[in-house]
C-alpha cells in the first residue's frame, strides 16, 4: 500500500489509480490453524523488515479466528461507491486497524464503525451502502477482474497504457 499511495500522490493527476479488491481469503469459514498462523507470522515479519509496517502479534492468540477478507473487501468497495478517492485511505485505515491495532475487521459492526467514522458518515448510512446488493455485486466484479488480470499476490500494481497492461509489483 505505501507504493500505491506514493504513486497516487505523485502521478494521480496523470495516471489515476483504480483500486480493485482481489479477495485474498474471501469466503473462508474455517478457523486458522497453528501452521497457518506460523506462516502468516513469518510473512508479517518479512513485511515489517521491508516496510516498517507495525503488527500487533496478539492476533495469533485468537483461538477460533476465521480469516475471511470478504467483509473488508466489501467495505472498501462500499467506500469507493461513496467517494472513489476514499477507497485507498479506507483500505489503509482497515490495514492499520487489523495489523497494528488487532481489530477484528471480519466483524461487520467493527467494519461499519471504522469506515463510517473515516468517511464522516453515520454508521446507519454506511451500513446501508455496505449491505446493498449493488455493493456485493461490485465486490464480486472486483474479484473477477483481479482473476482475469492474473493477479496472484497482494498487493499488485498494474499499469495500463492504452490497451496494454504491465505488472509493476506483485505481492
Residue ranges and their predicted role:
Residues 1-11, 15, 93-171:
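C-terminal cap of thioredoxin/glutaredoxin-like
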Residues 2-97, 107-108:
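Structural alpha/beta surface segment adjacent to cysteine/selenocysteine redox centers
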Amino acid at each position: 500500500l505505501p507504493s500505491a499511495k506514493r504513486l497516487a500522490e505523485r502521478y494521480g493527476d496523470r495516471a489515476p489509480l483504480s483500486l480493485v479488491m482481489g479477495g485474498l481469503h474471501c469466503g473462508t469459514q474455517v478457523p486458522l490453524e497453528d501452521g497457518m498462523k506460523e506462516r502468516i507470522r513469518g510473512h508479517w515479519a518479512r513485511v515489517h523488515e521491508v516496510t516498517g509496517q507495525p503488527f500487533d502479534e496478539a492476533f495469533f492468540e485468537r483461538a477460533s479466528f476465521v480469516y475471511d477478507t470478504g467483509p473488508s473487501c466489501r467495505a472498501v468497495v462500499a467506500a469507493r461507491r461513496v467517494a472513489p478517492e476514499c477507497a485507498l485511505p479506507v483500505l489503509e485505515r482497515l490495514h492499520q486497524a487489523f495489523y497494528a491495532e488487532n481489530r477484528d475487521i471480519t466483524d461487520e459492526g467493527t467494519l461499519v464503525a471504522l469506515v463510517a467514522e473515516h468517511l464522516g458518515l453515520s454508521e446507519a448510512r454506511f451500513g446501508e451502502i455496505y449491505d446493498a446488493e449493488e455493493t456485493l455485486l461490485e465486490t464480486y466484479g472486483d474479484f473477477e477482474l483481479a482473476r482475469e488480470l492474473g493477479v496472484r499476490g497482494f498487493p499488485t500494481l498494474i499499469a495500463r497504457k492504452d490497451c496494454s497492461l504491465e505488472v509493476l509489483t506483485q505481492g
